[in-house]
Amino acid sequence: MKDKFSAQREKMVQKQLAKRDIEDPKVLDAFRKVPREEFITESKQHQAYGDHPLPIGHGQTISQPYIVAMMTQALEPSSHDIVLEVGTGSGYQTAILAELTKKVFSLERIPELSEQAGRILSKLGYQNIVLKISDDDNDLTIHEQKEFDKIIVTAAASQIPPELTQQLKEGGTLVIPVGELMFQELLVVTKHNGELRKKSLGGCRFVPLK
């Protein structure tokens, strides 16, 4: 049975993602499955599939679908990956990752957002997600998992945090926006023989990480 947003969801996938440069069929399928409207307040649900960010409270936003898709595709997720997400936010990106990978650890510094995301993700039936609240803005570690195949950061850092690259497995990928408030660059960082290789996906605009 189709829900009332299913046509809007498919239109988003076709027009905002597939007609641009989102080509991975698994990524596109994940966006077909995850109901973005669930992660948005009821008064804004009619805008759920617009190509723009929306406020979620506490000075934070849910990113526009294309940005979430671009970052997800750049991560090159696979079904055996253990992933770290820094910045749970609404939980929408978390759900997309959970559709594509083995397990997602997601770290959030705002308790109310983490709790809200937890309720939504539980309602949707996800069982491969572990949500964590960071007690310290400078602590970006998950103590029960030392290394990750993939790391994604959904807020902008002034520079690439070394504690994240230290947690990245050899051959792993980190996707992170880096820069100051007025200019940021979305970077894809890979680790090869202990060395970091960086590729830019272009300019972007995210709320600050700290």
Swiss-Prot record:
Cite the active-site annotation: S63
EC assignment: the record states 2.1.1.77
**Which reaction does this enzyme catalyse, per its entry?**
[protein]-L-isoaspartate + S-adenosyl-L-methionine = [protein]-L-isoaspartate alpha-methyl ester + S-adenosyl-L-homocysteine
Specify one Pfam family: PCMT
Q: Which UniProt keywords apply?
A: Cytoplasm, Methyltransferase, S-adenosyl-L-methionine, Transferase
Q: Which GO terms describe its cellular component?
A: cytoplasm
Single GO molecular function: protein-L-isoaspartate (D-aspartate) O-methyltransferase activity
* Localization: Cytoplasm
Protein family (similarity comment): Belongs to the methyltransferase superfamily. L-isoaspartyl/D-aspartyl protein methyltransferase family.
Q: What is this protein called?
A: Protein-L-isoaspartate O-methyltransferase
Protein source organism: Natranaerobius thermophilus (strain ATCC BAA-1301 / DSM 18059 / JW/NM-WN-LF)
Which lineage? Bacteria, Bacillati, Bacillota, Clostridia, Natranaerobiales
